[in-house]
Regions:
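Serine-dependent amide/ester hydrolase catalytic core
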Residues: 1-48, 98-99
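Structural helix-boundary/capping segments
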Residues: 47-100
Length: 100
């Protein structure tokens, strides 16, 4: 990544917002997908490759559900990744507890 002048890759943590408890399927367009598979889809590659990645909260949907931001760094850049995440988190909306 450093050869390309990139410190980190920024991506969504998941392709969907946090699902409601017990939501086994999620509709995207005209298709239904297993919610669990969707939740793993975007963070599985870095995990399987052993590449440092971190997910931080980055906002909320209009329904108040949390949305995550994934940061991915080169295999030797875990300290840099943590510094980027720390700075990025200060720029995000403050976390709030959901009403139960």
């Amino acid at each position: 990544m450093a050869d390309a002048g990139v410190d980190a890759i920024v991506a969504p943590t998941t392709p969907i917002a946090a699902p409601l408890l017990g939501e086994e399927n999620t509709r995207i367009g005209k298709e239904n997908y297993p919610t669990r598979a969707l939740l793993l889809r975007l963070n599985r590659p870095a995990n399987l490759a052993g590449i440092p990645a971190i997910s931080i909260p980055c906002g909320f949907t209009s329904a108040g559900l949390p949305v995550g931001l994934q940061l991915i760094a080169a295999i030797t850049d875990e300290p840099l990744l943590l510094r980027i995440a720390q700075v990025a988190q200060t720029l995000m909306p403050k976390a709030r507890r959901p009403q139960v």
